């Protein structure tokens, strides 16, 4: 539910944005209208807003190489509508500040090229956290998040010479073209050379209705694997974060928690964390969200049985409801490849 299957042809990355819009305008608008009907909300509406994510869908899996934008469709008026719709001001402003930062990085080209360069958005976040006397992003309050949005937009104006776009469709077209263009970013080109993936294959762009892992303590986001990618062991595993969005899991801002009790206890032992501290501060999803865990475990089994291979999956929990974002055949070590293939053969899943 809520998926927009929209954009097909990679040669668009060679065109200017105006040509891409002209070619795809009707297709995109029809697909957005379909998603609006499914989600019973409206893109760009200030009373019942639909927010979307824009992500790549390359023919061959390229984990972490392509760009993604979340929470697209927000502006100063829509954020107030989101607050009225959800009754959750912190969530709405948190989503807004994340969107401005991602859009600035991916679409407006503000992400530093070199690690030594100052990231304007991260510098602002650290400044606000320091002034507030907190260490973690999720300790910031509504007024702090409003301040981040204000200062982020000022940074956009200063660096690009233009105001941050407020029109939902202007935001969407910028994101679509940026994701097409990310096929030719330096890390994606290098990855394709290493993996033997032809440049001509290109990528699709997928637009999905947003679900939110940052709506409070009954929401979460995570990644999981149907088998151990390092050893090939037939062991469901993964990581999740409560009250977070997908980028947080890999960004290292907070310590992710393990999906399973077994994985959580293994992690605690390696990290030198006592069982008492683990259970109190870093419980597994199996312990903290047992019903969601059961559903997740059942679905990962179903997906592996369907694709007949180890799966690498992304999911979000929004206020106690599980949503799957994507699945793909997982990358694995050479040793794991042999172990998984042997086990799948013995389990009758492959010939």
Regions found by a protein language model. Name each.
Residues 1, 5-351:
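Nucleotide/phosphate-binding sheet-loop regions of phosphoryl- and nucleotidyl-transfer enzymes
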